[in-house]
C-alpha cells in the first residue's frame, strides 16, 4: 500500500522546514500560525548553523486527548537551520523572548527574530527542520529544551 503525500500549503511558514508534516497533522491538517509566537532561545552552532526555541501562541483545536489528559495547552518547537548563507545579529537577545517570522524561500528558509532593541536575520539555501515538538502547560511557563 502506498502512502499518499499530503500537499502542504506552499506559502505556509513551516513549508521550508523538514518535519512540518507532523505539525500539520497535529493541528488537524491546518497550518499552525506564527501570530504571537515567541523565540525564547537562540544558539549559534558551527559550522554556520543556528538552533532556536519557538513557543507557539496557536494551539490545536480540539486539543489532542493526550494533551488534555496531561493538562497541556501549548506547543514548543526546537528549530534547526544548518548551512546558513547569512547570520546577521544586532543588539542583545532579550531574556523575555522576541517575535519570530519564518518564510520558505527558493528551496531554503528565512528566519527573522526581532524586538525594539534586537534584530536577527538568518537565511539558508536548504531547508531547516523542526527537530523537536514538546507540548506543555502554558500556566507552568515554557519548557526547558536544550539547544
Predicted stretch roles:
Residues 1-147:
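Surface-exposed, interaction-prone regions used to assemble/regulate multi-protein complexes
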